[in-house]
Amino acid sequence: MQNDEEPAAAAGTSGLSNGESLRSPPAPAPRRPKPGILRLDIGKPRRSSGGSVDFRCVGSSSSNGNTSNVATGANSENNSGVTSPHQLSVTWAPPCDLDRGGWQMQSSADAKREFYKGQRGRRAASQEDHRSYELNDFPLQNQSSDAESCHQEPHFAHQRSPGIGFDEDGGGGDIDDEESYTISVSAIMQRRASVRGYRGKRGSRSSRRASSPMDHVLDSVERRRSSVYTTSSEEGTNQESTQEQIFENIRLHKEVIQSVKLQPWPIRKKLKLVRQAKTYVARHEGALQERFAMSRSTRDLWARFKILMAARWRHWKRETASFLTVLIPWELRIKEIESHFGSGVASYFTFLRWLMWVNIMIAIPLVAFVIGPEYFATKHGETDPRKRMSDPEARVAGNLFTFWEFEGYLKYSPMFYGYYSSTSGISTSGYKLPLAYFLTAVLVYIYSFVATLRKMAENSRNSKLSSKDDECVFSWKLFTGWDFMIGHAETAHNRIASVVVGFKEALLEEAEKKKDNRNWRVILQRILVNILVMGLLGLSGATVVLLVNHSEDLAKHDNWLSRNAVNVTMTLLSFFLPMIFEALGLFENWHPRQQLRLQLARIMILNMLNLYSLMFSFIYKINSKEKPLQMLKLENETNTMELKNLLSSIEALRAMTPTTSLYGESTSDGLFDDSTSTATWGEDGGGLFSTTAAAALISTTVQRLKCYNMTVKCSKLRRNIISGKHLATTLMVLNLTTPAMVPPTLPTTLPTTFPTTLPTTLPTTLPTALPTTLPTTLPTTLPSTLATTTATTSSIWSTTEETSPTTTTTSPWTTLPPSTTTTEATTTTERATTTTEATSTTTLKITTAEINSTLSDTTKPLGKSIDTEIPNSTTNSATLSTIPATLNTTNLPLNSTTKLTTTTSTEKPQGEDNFIYTTGEDEGSYDYGSDSTSDAPDNNSYSDITDYSSEPSEIEDFDEQESTDQADDPLAKVLEQLDENETKGRRKRALAESPFFTSKYSRRHRNESAVSAGQPRETTESVNATPSRWPFNWASFRQTTPRTTTTRRVPSGILTKEEWERLRRLRGRITTTTSTSTTSTTTRRPRWRYRTTTTELTSTTEEESSTTESSTDSSSPGSTTNAFDSSSSTTEEDEYTTTEGSENRPYYVGYVDISEMGSTIYYDGDSEFLEECVITICPKGDDFFGSTTESPDSTTQSSDSKQLTTVKLTPLERKQKRLKEVQLAIKQIQTNLTTMCWETSLGQELSKVIVFDGLMSIVAPLCIDFLRALFVRYVNQNWCWDMEKTFPQYGDFKIAENILTLINNQGQVWMGIFFSPGLVLINLVKLMIMMYFRSWIVLTCNVPHEVVFKASKSNNFYLSLLLTMLFLCVLPVGYAIVWLRPSWHCGPFSEYNRIAEFITNTTRNALPKQLHEPLDYLTSSSTVIPLLLLLILIIYYLVSLTGALREANQDLRTQLQKEREEERKKIFKVPEVKQAEPTATTLTNRWRKVLEASSPVTPTQPPDFDTEEYKNQARKELISRIMKKALRKGSATSDEDSFVRRDDDDTDTEHQDSLPHDEEAKDKRFGLSRLQQIRRTRKPSLVDIVQIAKQERARAGSIVAGTSSSGTGNFPIKETHPKSRFKVEKHERKDRGSMKDKKDTRHRQSPQQQQQPPPYESPKDNEHDPDTNSRIVSASLLRRHKEQAEGEEPPTTPDAPQTPNSPVEPVEQALEESTPETPTLAKSKFHIVDEKKPPPHEVEDKPLPTPKESGSGGGSLGKFKFRKHKFKSNNVAAVKPEPEVFKFDERSVERSSDVPATHAAEYLNNEPSGTEEQDRSLPSPTPSQGQGHHQRQLSVLSRQGRKKIGNLLALVREAVNLKKDDVEQAGSDESPGPTTPTYLAYTPPPPPSVLSSVSSSTALEMPPTPEPESPTPSAPLHFGSSTSSRAPSKPPKPPMVPASATAPTATMDDLEELDTAGPITFPRRSDSHRRRTMRQDSQSSIWSDNIPTITISTTGSDECIVDAAAPQNGLPDPRSASPEPTVNIIRIDIENEHEK
């Protein structure tokens, strides 16, 4: 909270922010004094806050209401004790004339300004002032000048008197103020002279404190000041000097204006001073300007201009600064929340605001470099499918659900990855969008890391800077907690709430430190809770994974919940599980902050689990989408190529319609028939058709041509017969359908192979494999595809090929293959081949059937190929497995399984491919299958297809003209050759396909090779080609083109069998295994990869198929080659004559091979050797169709019935018809592609999660907080229980959940930013909405947490969670960039295999080649691993260094603290007295003195020092103690405390959190006996032991005596903290031994004594240790007197009236025992509990008190936890009145404690009640009051230290003398108010050990002024409670020994006091202290500044620090009763209080 931070500010600042200071004295109108914001009574003295500095003039001390003597400025400053003179640029005039008004100037500038304003009228005065300033006699000059100015001012001010005579109140107040003003001004001047000396005008200006808020004011007078100022005298006739003086005075006044606000005066006084100074400044500035105006010199004009400009500039600067503070978003809102709910809740909002800044910074580069350019560069009518939605989408784009799903307009917007393109938009203008996209994303992630780390480092620094906060937590809070600039009631209310909450936080910290965490029950609970939490986390992760895996099934249910199951579930999990975690966390019993952190960590793990489950399941889905995507790509490319070819061929056909028709009928048909033929040939020689791809394409073509070619073995020329045009057309079709592979091969291959193969195969295989098979197999393999295919096939067969394409298309939609299949199916329909086409698989199967026969021979060799193939085309086989099975079944008989499989496979593979493609028919399917097998293969397939097309198609495709030409007969020839060569020379595509080209892209090569193998059937190749990326394909194509050309040449030239074989072998294909066609294929394949691979590819296409298709596939490879070379033939040949095939292949006589293939049986050598001639038979087309059609039903035969009308169509019609189909297919592909962009879909999912989460974060609070609050608020009145207090209550703000929601939300944004750049903008809107909504909910419906705790100051815990989240969220993005293949149809990286490839290639291209190798080396593991090791070592080193520096820092801090202590001691050191040192000698001397002085028992050694010496010592120690406390150096701030806190909270928590009693060490010291203390520091010396023994004896004697001995025991030995500790240790030791015995007695006594001591202490805030000492010294006397006085106590009651003076003591008491002190402290807050036996002791004490009220008072002190003096003799001591050195004014105690002057009996009652009251009072309100009171007292003490000490000593003296009797009586009578007894010493001092335990008693060794004079003191001692801690202020006690006054430190109460030297009479305290050491110390220290004995126990444990002050009379009975020290604790239950 601010409170905590403010203390960190220099003590000089009273907690005002600079901004406020800027705004404070309204600078805007410096000329006109304005009324102040707060109006306070000027007359009313105001205490300075701890942080303020008092500048006192000697005479003015009264003005402050402080009685401190301000003899000199230095003294006054010292007295203030808050700021050192150098902290302020202005020094308040120390000695000032009273006339001047003992002003303590706050800011010289301000004061002067006001002062001068007051003097506005008199320049002369100002001059005088200047003069005076110049003179070093500041006080006099100032006074004179001020006086003069005032006199001169009359016109300006009411008074002529001291310059500030404008007291609004007027009259004396004015005079006082004026005096103060003049004094302040003079002080300022003096300070300036002394500190700065008067330097030249410029110099002085520059010397001004740069930080001063009024810099501008001073600067305004940027006048040249020459030494003249200082030198000029009086008005100085010299105008220049006057000007300079005026400048100087103006500057000084401005400085006064600046620093006034730091003063502790009443606000009215400050305002008046400021107004006067401003008036002066305004007037004199105006005068100067007038003077300048009269002067015409350039210099004056320039000066005038400068003045004007300076004023304007200052004004503008300040206005700007004020305006900027308003611009900080939500600052005021957050401050308001902080004041009501604590820093923990506010930390959420500051964190949210910081996150918003980070998001803005992330959004800027994204918008500037990615979103903006692409959006603005996109034209309105963009045709790019990435930027334009399809018609179906456009129709629903405006629906709400469409927006909710981020579809429609949002999907086609720059928000998502898919919108960006490297080919359209800004890229067309030369902007490298992919590079910009990638680099911006990297920049965003780097910035996120850097911003988070910078913030963490900054927070660490800040928390280090505030480390001193842990020194005096409570004083800082109390003294500097208020903001004096507050001018609004509501704000003041907030501030009060904030201060209270701050105290609660600090107290909680203290309480938590006392907890014992080692408890088996707690440990077990924690273990159980953690097990449960882990189980819940595992369940949530499993739920998300399960949901994502089934999301597709769920999406089929068309309802909102099913579609959004994933994000709804994630939101619900993140909503409910944290609640469960929170409930479980309650069982763990952690500190609220620790519990919060655990909760945060658990929720963090939960969110990360859910997020990661989501990401990984998405990645699996993405992987599953990849194959269909590649199929679609292949199909798309095939169709695109076909479209291109169709267009060109249509043009060609139109040009040559007649020929074309004929050809179309015959050659074309032949060509097509080759494809189509397959069906027909399927009947005849299915072999031709075997090339499914070709068949498919051809069938399509045939459908168009309506005729099929019959393959007959003939010379190779025959192949040429196929008209080039038809071939071209076919090839084009094939290209379009498949990547044009089919056309080239098909015409040749189909006719050749299919004729033979098809018929046989069709019937046999086809039924199974083809339509039938397709249905059968496909259904199995490709249920959807097959079904489609089958249906298509059937319809196609019966209907038209068109249908089939459509159907196919549908299937392909499922997977691309189907579309291909459709084409093929269509082909099949058109011809019998349709079967092949539609189910190329089928056709192949037909081929297989034939091939089975033929292949039977060949199949086996093929089988090997196939087998090889199959592995490659695993996918296909899997896909086609069904088909293969069917085929196998059908074919098996024919071939060996292998052969049959091979044949079947060929067909099947196409089907499979189709299947994989879903419909890719033979060609498409097959290719797809191959592709399918491996994505790369797909790509390869695609390439292959391309090659296929390429040959015919590439020529046609690539070279449409060529294709067209080839369409002519030459083309047909080429195509035929290609078909045969196609295997080799499907080249164009094959090129892509070709092994060599393939090798380029290994995956593609594999695919391509597979494709080649399978592709020989063009389909496969097409497929393969398609699979290969277009880029690759095209490259391949291009390369292929040459290759194709080569291939074509080869086809034309026809490779020799040897060449083919060689090629095939190169491929590693089973050339031999496969027939020649296979070989050809193989050869071709081999180029690709392997003959086997080819086979495999085929096989791949139809993985299983490959088996079946071995021949086909093999043959596919060969056959494919054949198919392309001679499709069917190849298949069969492969199977049946690998050798033959090889031979043919060399020729790559597609037709021959095909014909051979066609005649499945003949393939062996003949088919391959002979070229097949294709005879176009239209009727057969029917057969073909029939066979195809039937083939689904009846294998092949339906081809007859199937005659397609297509056959009758002219080639042109067919092409046009096909064109429509292709266009439709392409459209369907595009439709399918719209949902296939995985990057966009991932971005959409994350966007939905974020938006849904945002909605939940609004809806949930509305229901959970708002509606509940309404219900509770308005229904509570009529409810049967109190809903506000019990259930359901008002909601509180769940910090952990809300913080984690923010972090999780930001993690999702980071994860999605790469896939959805627009996500940041959505998140920004969400964050702003959440800020407003959440802050409204918090302020409206929430209540602060019951347990308020401080947020870690740095909030680094939140940031570390954020950093972890950032790191974890970058990992999936990195994975996607490096490992996942980007979608090929969307996004800027669609052309690359991997997104990372892009950046690699870009880098390589940008760098010269010479650097490539070094780069490769640098990025290799040989460099990276050593680098990582090096970094790890560096990190280790830095971590070690940090640890060492932290330790050094700690040591330095300790050293500083010690030095500070020493300085303070010197400052407060009384010149005559030398500070007591903890050395053994000093201790010895002190003990000796104590024993001699106070103990009648040990009068042995007369004190070496006179009573005066003792007094001096006591005084000295008291002063040092006061200093410590004032500066908060005391116990709370002890090093140990700081250390603890630092180590614990370091950067995360505020050091201020710890309470003073945190320091166990100190507490321990207090609790320790003297010997123990000595041992801590050194080895106890013999002297120590002797002294201790004497003390013990003395104590025992005192206990026994009960009178003087107690005095002796109490006899304060002045000790510094260390000594006190030693005493405590000794005391404890003694306590353990004799104390136990004495304890009871002591308990009785100590309660009384303690009661008295606290009051006594309270007066001095434990700093009255001297009093305690005095008490101790005179304890014995007091005891005697007490016994006597018990009766007299009632008289003491009158002393109570002095309570006002003694309030401090009472306060302490109140803190210690609220009873006595309640008046001051609002007793209710602090309960005094006897630690050991609080109630019993109280009771005991009470009884004892009854006899001796003071004793009872002691008892209450005992409760205070003052060590109960173990003076069993206390009773005796009580009997002995002599030692009663101090007796607290029991009355005051009573008054303060609520138990007013209760008699002994009453006291007994009251005391307990006091305790109770204190418990009640413990509520922070009282503590704060007490604290405030005490702090004020403290400040007074610090200021008036000497006076107070003197007074206190006097009081102690009085108390000792006068109060002996009174105290005794008062103690017994007033026991209720025992706290009042200032004379702690009164408590029968225990033997030295007691003293030691009382350590604070050390301070004053008062010669026991046994005289009853002390009685008076009882009242005076009370002074602490009502009075500021100036106990001494009670002069009535002057009789008390001054030393005793010092002694009175409420040692018992304030551990600090105990620490400090001074007689502390808490004998009992030793043990209790030991127990309570920590708590007491820190607690007491908390209030120690001014609250002597109050122990604040957050835990509320009895171990409060409140040890009874030294038993006053030492009613020994209560204490004595129990030998063990009874600790009376004041327990302040803050929580209880709050509840109350």
UniProtKB/Swiss-Prot annotation:
InterPro entries listed in its UniProt record: TMC (IPR038900), TMC_dom (IPR012496)
Ranges per topology, Cytoplasmic: 1-353, 419-432, 548-567, 621-1308, 1380-1423
Any one of the GO CC terms: plasma membrane
A Pfam family hit: TMC
Protein topology in the membrane: Multi-pass membrane protein
Bias type Polar residues, positions: 74-90, 227-243, 870-885, 933-952, 1806-1838, 1976-1990
Subcellular location: Cell membrane; Cell projection, Dendrite
Keywords from the UniProt entry: Cell membrane, Cell projection, Ion channel, Ion transport, Membrane, Transmembrane, Transmembrane helix, Transport
Compositionally biased spans, kind Pro residues: 1903-1914
Acidic residues bias spans: 166-178, 953-967
Region (Disordered): 1-178, 194-243, 789-839, 860-967, 996-1027, 1066-1143, 1186-1205, 1527-1572, 1592-1841, 1859-1990
Biased composition (Basic residues): 198-208
Taxonomy, superkingdom: Eukaryota
Transmembrane spans: 354-374, 396-418, 433-453, 527-547, 568-588, 600-620, 1309-1329, 1359-1379, 1424-1444
Ranges annotated as biased composition (Basic and acidic residues): 125-134, 216-225, 1538-1566, 1614-1640, 1658-1668, 1727-1743, 1777-1793
Expression across tissues: Expressed in multi-dendritic neurons of the labellum (md-L), which extend elaborate dendritic arbors innervating the bases of taste hairs (at protein level). In larvae, expressed in class I and class II dendritic arborization (da) neurons and bipolar dendrite (bd) neurons (at protein level). In adults, expressed in various sensory neurons including those in the mouth parts, olfactory neurons in the antenna, wing bristle neurons, haltere neurons, arista neurons, and many other sensory neurons, including a subset of chordotonal (Cho) neurons.
One GO-annotated biological process of the protein: larval locomotory behavior
Biased composition (Low complexity): 58-73, 886-906, 1069-1083, 1091-1100, 1107-1130, 1890-1899
Primary location class: membrane
Reported consequences of knocking out the gene: Viable and appear morphologically normal. Adults display a significant reduction in the electrophysiological responses of multi-dendritic neurons of the labellum (md-L) to mechanical stimuli. Adults are unable to discriminate between the preferred softness (1% agarose) or smoothness (sucrose solution only) from harder or stickier food options. Adult females display a reduced ability to discriminate between small differences in egg-laying substrate stiffness. Larvae display abnormal locomotion behaviors that likely result from the loss of proprioceptive feedback.
UniProt topological domain (Extracellular) ranges: 375-395, 454-526, 589-599, 1330-1358, 1445-2036
PANTHER family: TRANSMEMBRANE CHANNEL-LIKE PROTEIN, TRANSMEMBRANE CHANNEL-RELATED
Described purpose of this protein according to its UniProt entry: Probable ion channel. Component of mechanosensitive neurons that participates in proprioception, sensing food texture, and directing egg-laying site selection (oviposition). Component of multi-dendritic neurons of the labellum (md-L) where it is required for sensing the hardness and viscosity of their food, enabling them to behaviorally discriminate their preferred softness and smoothness from harder and stickier food options.
Protein family according to the UniProt entry: Belongs to the TMC family.
Protein name: Transmembrane channel-like protein
